[in-house]
Amino acid sequence: MRAIFTSLFLLTTVLTMADGTELTPRARKLLHGRTVEVDLGFAVYKNRSARSIAEEIVANGVEGVYYFVTAEHAVRKDVIAELHKRGVPVAAMAIASGAYLPVDERPEGWEKYRMEFTNSRMDEYKFMSFVHRDYAIWMKHRIVRLINEYGFDGFTFAEAMYPITDGLERQDVLYGDISPAFQAAFKNATGDTVFPEFVDSAKPNYYKSIPKIYNDLVEFRIRTVNDFYNEVVNGEDGVREKCPGVFVATWTMGISIPNGVAKLREWEGQDIPSMITQVKPDMHFIQTHWPDWSNHELRGDYPLLYKPFLDLIKKTDPNMPIGFQTDLVSEPGARRPPDWQKLFYETCEQLKLDCTTYYIFCLRWAVYREPPQLCTVRLVWKDIVELCFDKRISNECGNIVLNRKMIVVDNGKSYSVISADVDGNLLKVVLDGDLSGATEITVDIGGIKDDPDYRLAPKGEVNIVPAGTFRKLPLQ
């Protein structure tokens, strides 16, 4: 059973975009179901065909993909095309601040857009600030080009925010943007003549001592985030105008702390009602914040703790579809096992959420902890069979199965492998006989293994299918 279902009534109310344009049939699929975040820059996607990547994604029951785009030159158009052949929609996901953009793909003179903070903790990242209209216009053209050139079905920004989390409550205070450009823009927009101080409580402009001005700053940050998002989506020559029929999702964080909605509004400039009202998305996502995903003790039913965020979406727009993003793997010690995932999906169904996604497909539990699972078998030619596994297998598997009596058909006749080739998660075997007419086969997959060299460190152990393991599957 799928964990996410959407009522027919809700579906029929959201197939038309905010500007009256209907979503394309493939883009509509992003409104519901289980999706994943994919970053094709990881080693596991190297030296294999685009078809094998698409087959692995589909073999895992994925119904939609959020393609995490950092370097535009590295986007795999061939993988997107292969997913489309299989009916899987692909949305582009970008970081709104451009934090991970390679220097050679940043706007000219990008340094003038850079956020500044009260300490050096964020210096390793290169966040660009939402206060700069020319940066928003540059990003708008970039996103439109990405969608149209690579054939994306949808688009979203992750982390359109000022990334300080609880920085105001730390001993070593973290706050931003405090760049001269941001301060000037704030004063110009509000008429305030001073900018708050966040570190030295003895100064007369310490933020707690000037609550009216500080509140102006809170509201100003929210406006800059929403204006940036809105410019990219609804501005002249933006996504709605230049990419008709494309799905658009807005995206804010959630967190399991008391008064979390108000705190993220204040801390990071994230305001669900105004973002939805201004940008008019097809769906709104809640992303799991790092204090939660890094918590090894986090329970799989934690979406219940995010209910204030979910309720606020429905209060803003009762017909707005809701997506929920979880993080299964960013903290190696908190890689979430199958029972945790099962509880998570059951909880999302209980909350009547429309869609889920997770970070990130290639680092999931099964890649590190489980032997390869055979998902489908396909007759390529009368004596050639392609075995599709749920993850990348070792290139040694071709030699492992060579000369093995590997396949038994319905009538009990067995066939040996005379040659074999590995392509990612696909194992193509040439047999010593004709399988034409067979409808179901039994496959000996004992000894099939994965390869830790393709994993992100810590790489873990080799996972091997135990000897004597057989799978009976229909022959497609």
Task: List PLM regions with ranges.
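Catalytic domains of carbohydrate-active enzymes, especially glycoside hydrolases
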Residues: 43-73, 149-153, 275-287, 347-357
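Aromatic-lined carbohydrate-recognition surfaces of secreted/lumenal glycan-active proteins
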Residues: 91, 156-160, 214-266, 287, ...
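Aromatic- and acidic-residue-enriched segments that line the glycan-binding/catalytic groove
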Residues: 99-122, 159-204, 261-263
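Substrate-binding cleft of secreted/luminal carbohydrate-active enzymes
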Residues: 277-371
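A short glycine/threonine-centered beta-strand motif
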Residues: 381-402, 431, 445
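Short, surface-exposed alpha-helix to beta-strand junction/turn motifs within ectodomains of secreted
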Residues: 392-419
